[in-house]
Amino acid sequence: MVNSKRQQRSKKVASSSKVPPTKGRTFTGCWACRFKKRRCDENRPICSLCAKHGDNCSYDIRLMWLEENIYKVRKHSLISSLQARKSKSKPLCQKISKSRFKQMTHFRQLSPPTSDCEDSVHEASKETTLPNDNTFTISVRRLKIYNNAVASVFGSMTNRDYTQKRIDKKLDELLNMVENDISVVNLNCSKHGPYSVFRANPAAVTSALTDQLPSPGHSMSSAEETTTAALSSPPEDSTSLIDIIQGKIFGILWFNCYGNMILNRQEYTTWFINKMRNSLTTEFIRFLGKIIDDPDINMASCLFKECIARWSCVDWQSIAITMLVIIHGYTCPNLTKLLRVWFLQQKLLRFSMYPLVNFIINNTQDLDVLYHCNGLLGNADLFEDPYQDELTSELHVLVTERLVNSWKDTILQQLCSCQDTTLSCSQLRYWQLQLKCNQQFYKDVYAMQD
């Protein structure tokens, strides 16, 4: 009996000395507690910590791409001086003041006010802090995307709703509209996708944002701005020309440039866009739009033949064939045969053919085509653009490397078939020497400049 009582006492002491288990970290508190990294008891409508510290308690849903952190606050003089120096070469329309940003976005705080009194307090505090030296900038393109998205998801300023149910329903509707919009075939419409569904907010359109903005992209942005400025006043018979260039051709190049080292270069892209703007006619631009609108692989060879028959200019043919190859690749045997015949007929390498040459080198194993490509690069006239000589040297290295690999494969096949490899080994040594010379030339002339 005594031992049993002692055991019960020891169990009670041990249980009382145990530390109560701590709760794990939660991710469902109000926004004020999340920002201050404190534990929220999630009381509604105001948690105890927000009530104690006088913070604005909000459980509203926020989309990450609508946050106010898309602008940069310049708090230090060093950052301000650097930004001021960089801004001298940029147009003034690319910057807006803090007060102007607030007026254009109708955005006062991260979450809606819980009462009219709270809204007036925030307005007064904003007005008192505006004249300080800390300013921030935002690009015009981001401002437009932000301004459009707020109205399309959360509703207008008077009927704005941040609740989870409203946002889930609205996003489902918009995404369904995007899917339906892509599936609809409308010959009169040149653009599909989210930008035709997430409509602009007409109340926020001002004279400062009336300039046409370039499509988002990689290194093509500066060239697109040049083209947009030059085409801002088009003739009446070429109204659809700008839509085709901006809505179709630029989009195709942007999504497919990463597999082509020529289209991925800003210098070549600038030249390419200027070439289209200055030399291509409205009829030919519409033909390019027809190539993009008709992705049927069976029509690729027909469009190829139509281009060769209608236009004799090698530059125009190169641009059209490049668009066909970008869209269809080497999945169409008839298109590949036509491309081979057309390329072998070329006696002079034009600068407009460079993206096509890059596609051919990366996708063909035909030695005749590679030899012809190497010969064209060796005899190219480097007068169309100052950057042409460097790209020519890079393509020369690429094609000789491709020839070296082709002869290595040939020798391996001959060894497996117990055939004589004397001639193949001679060819391999020759192209290895050519590759070494081309690489050394590029390294000495261009790599040292970088």
From Swiss-Prot:
Biased composition (Basic residues): 1-12
UniProt keyword annotations, A-Z: Activator, DNA-binding, Metal-binding, Nucleus, Thiamine biosynthesis, Transcription, Transcription regulation, Zinc
CDD domains with a match to the protein in the record: GAL4 (cd00067)
PROSITE patterns, alphabetized: ZN2_CY6_FUNGAL_1, ZN2_CY6_FUNGAL_2
Annotated Low complexity bias: 13-23
Gene Ontology biological process terms, A to Z: positive regulation of thiamine biosynthetic process; positive regulation of transcription by RNA polymerase II; thiamine biosynthetic process
Compartments reported by the entry: Nucleus
Main location class: nucleus
Residue range(s) of DNA binding per entry: 30-57
Domain of life per record: Eukaryota
MF term (GO), any: DNA-binding transcription factor activity, RNA polymerase II-specific
GO cellular component, one term: nucleus
PANTHER family: ARGININE METABOLISM REGULATION PROTEIN II, OLEATE-ACTIVATED TRANSCRIPTION FACTOR 1-RELATED
Protein name: Thiamine biosynthesis regulatory protein
Organism: Saccharomyces cerevisiae (strain ATCC 204508 / S288c) (Baker's yeast)
